[in-house]
Amino acid sequence: MSILDWLIVLLPVAFVMYMAVHSRSYVRSVADYLAAGRICGRYVISVADVANALSIIVLLTQVEMYYKTGFAMSFWNKMMGPLGLVLSLTGFCVYRFRETRAMSLGQWLEMRYSRSFRIFAAALRSVSEMFANMIMPALAARFFIYFLDLPHEFTLFGHTFPTFMVVVVITLSLATTIICLGGTLALVITDTIQGLFCYPMLVIFTVFVLCTFSWTKEIIPVMSDRVAGESFLNSFDVDKLRDFNVFALVVTIVVTIMHRASWIGAGNTSAAKTPHEQKMANILGSWRNGFMTIFYVLMAITLITLFNHRNFSEKSKAIRNYLSHHISLQMVKDDAQRAEFDAAIAAIPPVTHEIGVDEPLSQDKNMDTPYYDTAREQFFRINGVPELTQQLETLKATNPGDTAAIAAAEDELRKKTGLANKNTQEYSTLYRQQMLAASMRNLLPTGLTGLFCLLMILMMVSTDDSRMYSAALTITQDVILPFKKNGFTPKQHIWVIRLVTLGVAVWFFLGSSYMSQLDYLKLYADIMCSMWLGGCGPVMIFGLYGRFGTTLGAWLSLVSGMLLSLGGMLVSRNWADIVYPWLDKHGWLPALTNLLPKLSGPFEPYILWRMDPQKFPINSTEIYFITMMVSMILYFVGSGLTHLIWKPGPFNLDRMLHRGKYNDEGKPEEKFDWSPKAIWAKIIGITPEYTKGDRAIAYSVFIYSFVYGFGLSFIGVLLLNVFGVWQADWWKYYFFVVFILEPCIIGVISTVWFSVGGFIDLRQLFRDLRNRKNINDLDDGRVNNGVSVADAATVASEEASDDQK
């Protein structure tokens, strides 16, 4: 990068770090450090969430997905629009959790269930979260090595150091510094500033892509050049594109509802002035989320057009050579073998595919296929597979009676073949994940290169500090604090969190070093997250909205979900080499072969279970759904048994939510109005707390998301296709208007809107921090007899008053 690019990167990052240092002077209590004093406005939270939502791992995952599917699947994603809208407008889970005034998930779990359950659940969530997120610095480090063309190793004072680990240390140091300086307050302030930087940059890169590639002459021809069943444009011609059916949609809907609160309880979720402000921040998020999605789509379109259109054949060839060379530097240690590997890749000719003349591209045969095939041949050569194959054939021909030698040769061949296949898979994984880094390095001019690097750094820092802080907060508040009967002093409390944060940073460093090869990332993340997500849904939803749930039900739900998820994932991972042979050895295959089709029969073709020696018959989506249903059933069974045997009575929700006689904020109790107008307002989440401006925002979100986004652009187009009115050629206009033009207009407007609102709210936040007078040192997350220690005096007074009456 040029000096200008480095200035563009360093100055904003330095300003972000300065604001983190500045925030430290405003931390006067544990509540400030843990929940930003609970005085944040809606725009501060919403803009900060922009930075949290943008991450390198999400960018790479989304770009990889859209690179494989194009626009076509985006149309079907609109089916989820009404659900997300309703959840945002009603403040589902978020509003009630803020009403509890809990500083962490565990504090609420103890208020709702028990202390032992708090400790177990918090520990489980922390372990799951830390294992799943510790790979994020590794992904970021690898991205910057490819984007900045850094050497994989460098020598300093006669010692050789891996660049990868140095970048990881820098990444974690930035995140750890922000956390230790001001906790949630520092995160909110720095994330808001990063969000204010990010949104204009998204607009700039969107304009750049649309000006670099012609929509009608380059993008659409490439997107149209796909075989039947794998269309990148026609949303009704995607049956061979990926697994997509009614059952998958049902699971997505269930997951969206059941896990609405599964990761709640840290940072911004407890920082709003009131539950209403938290709810409005989520509603405002509906305006910003769409533009982030189009950024991911446009980055994928950039890669699709760049790598598949002959107008960019020379540039794409140079990028592919650069990308493969970096991968070979990482994977092939022998200089001579690496030179031969690079020469074989360089010998692949540039793109000569002529759209409309040559055979359309597919997932199995496309412009990347020659690179995967060549890499596979080279890895087989490097591992000596051809020589071992020849030696085995010679041994069988010359000495067929030497069974021991033949068996040993076969074992060695299998071992080397497996290693070559693993190397090929690792190459393809790195190739897909680093396509964006290599492409943007070679595509962007001076100035924009620095802006893109800045955007990636902000994505990295905002995500790493949030994930690390979430884990540190959960461990401190919900695993350590419950064992401290009298709590810590405020100063001790904050230092404990800082020390735990350092421990989490070390854990992330060690995890990144072991996960540096980036192999099986999705499977690994799924297994780790499922430890918590498998059974936490019923615990969260019915704990916030029901009086029936009990501690026994919560235990059964969480433990069963954890065991079923882990069991399903591990069986799936080891099916071909361990589980299937074991079933065959014990004679269970015939029975299972007959049983599985009978079990899936009522749900076919959406669920199809057939015995297969290579693949576990039940896929991950089905495992996830079964786990959620079993854990939900056990939650109610356990709760029912508790009420049947011990008869504890219904849980006191009013006390937990500070409602009714426990309302210490002077808010009038809302009485439901059964008039049509009131019912309609209730449906879209409007309450007496809404001002005229709030109502305008809520109605605008409803009209845009439901009436236009779902009604016209999805249901309307769906009906036109069903009745045969829609023409295949119309898709290019549809996607340009709905997925390009409209989000760009909204992006420009919302950039100005959120920037002004975020700046005003941020300034007000500093004013409120300076002018605070009532600071409660007991507000530190402790719970006593199901009541927050900070609320104990108020609750005792109200209950004593009731006893006198």
Regions found by a protein language model. Name each.
Residues M1-W753, R772, N776, V795:
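Membrane-embedded helix-loop-helix hairpins and adjacent transmembrane boundary segments
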Residues S755-G758:
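Juxtamembrane alpha-helical signal-transduction segment immediately C-terminal to a transmembrane helix
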Residues N771-T794:
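Solvent-exposed, non-transmembrane helices and loops of integral membrane proteins
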Residues E798-K805:
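Long, low-complexity, intrinsically disordered segments
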